[in-house]
Every structure is written in C-alpha cells, then in structure tokens.
C-alpha cells in the first residue's frame, strides 16, 4: 500500500492511517529530511524484528523522537550535549547517546547507546506525535545498488512494497544520509559526514 502525504501540509486522516498501521505491529517506509527510511513503533518487538529482517544488515537502528524533551526520555543527555542537540535539531543528524532505561532490550541487544533523530520534515514529526512514542528507524539505502531507488517513493514501493505494510509517498527524497555524531565521550565526534553541517 502506498499513501500520498504532502510534507508541507500533512493530512491528519492519512497520518492516522499510518499510526494505525504502526500500532498493529506494522513496518512503514517514510520520508525524512535526508533519505527515505524504514520505520516501526519502538513499543512493538514484533515490528522491530520484522524491520531487522527487511533491512538484512547488522547496522545499528536509530529512533526518531518528537522533540528534545522526548530524546531525554530515552537517552542520557548532559548539559553540553543538550546544547549541541538544541543548535542542530530538527535537522539531518543522527546523534549517538547513552541509552536510558526506557529503551527496550529488544532494540538495544546488549548495546548501551542509542542513535536519535528529529528529522526536519513534518511527516515523521506528526507520526511520532500522534503515535505517542518514538519510531525505530533505518535508512532505505544499499551501497551495492543504484542509489536512485532511495529517492523515488514509487521505486521504493516496487522494491519493498511486498515486505512492508505501508509506503508513504512524500515526494522525492534526498540521496545523502544524515551526519552521524557520537556524543558518548568528552567531545562530539563526527563519524560519518552526511547532509548536515554540525554547529558546535
């Protein structure tokens, strides 16, 4: 199933349809401010397993939060790190932080860190707001494939439509992933330079 949602003015009925899929252990594909991404509810162990199987990679999953206070529910955020987050979010960044006790074991799998995002795109922002908890997320990206399929929702639907429960057509996406910043040490460390230019 593919659903058209305009990021400039997301339709509440369509967002509710997406939320209903997520609440029923569904996996979706949705637009961000970078590449398209797979997503499921953090509260659904069944959906997290399904997402991992679709992704078929060992790469770490991240979570999408609604705002900075939402991040502090799921990660330990010291004051200097909070200031960096505040300067750069919403935006095309994934910040790696120390996970709090509210992050399910199914997500962590013996890891102590959690990647967090707040994309600058109203579609995922509203999905998380109305779902009431973060999305577990992983980029629709394969280094061995032609990268175009990550930008065109119709092509994504052709490739993954039978594996996911819903694909959101939010227009063409970007073909560059987020900048990944580790904030678990003394200083923020960029481990992957992507679309965003970090402001310290």
Residue ranges and their predicted role:
Residues 1-200:
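Active-site-adjacent structural elements in enzyme catalytic cores
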